[in-house]
């Protein structure tokens, strides 16, 4: 598989992965938006814009066109990366070689994607009132209902408290008021600003690289902006001064303990080491946390860790009996101390490396996963093949993992508890 990065214009890059392995191909167009601008309007754009466009104003007409294109798919969504999120227009389609009637599937799907992206359904300089109000309601309803999922609520609450005042805290906000203030015209203004200024990364996974390059230049011409903003991460490491503790009482039986940690953002040189540490410490079924805190000591119902490599933030989340809070907390930190000291076996290290390497190699199973992989590589400033990454993973040493562990510092503790005699009202 051949990877190539090509600058189409200022702030607009094309990344291609040439392969003939699959029957389908993938085309994605990312518009990068800094979280520092609190992009509430932008959050509504994917669902509003995929309801219809000027040429196909209803979902039924869109579906009919996609059916004609051999069940191609087009969508829009909002992946996040560090202190940025991406308004991504995505498509997947069958290769033209498999069309029995000489249909230009690739060209037709790309044209439909451009229709959704560049010619949205607009009336009097604004998006549809109906679609905008519907998506505002859906978003506000989802935010109000977030508390019903106690596991994700506790994790997000800890991260919001830990990252208060930082751009990334936007991702964990449950405030509905900014969404209620959005109008169809203000939403359209946000769309126009993105199209005019946002950095663009286009990814293509397939056989016809010339096709992708033609599309990229066509898009550049349609947008008519040779000098877009340039992506630059503003994430900085904020060393914890002291551990902060927060508690909330809810109508639950099973308490939740979430510990937020800080580390420096990962770099292309150490991301593999840190992920091996994550696998070893708390991110796999054979991790230190699962094996000891849950299985051996029975201090929790579940216990796992998760890291955002771009911000350096990491959390350990557990479901526990309230009376086990201190025991679980101390054991979680004790297991971290053991890893810092290199107190783990060669077998544990090998399992962690192989588990992570297998995850990376599974990227090669589909065009969409490859597209996501090369996009992340581009954002990090280093695109390697999955095989090259797997080789780097397998070379990680015990001392490197211990050193990575020593960079992880506890910052914020969030404890959610209730009256364990009450009926639990949670999903």
Model-assigned labels for residue ranges:
Residues 15, 23-35, 40-41, 60-115, ...:
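M16 family metallopeptidases and their MPP-like homologs
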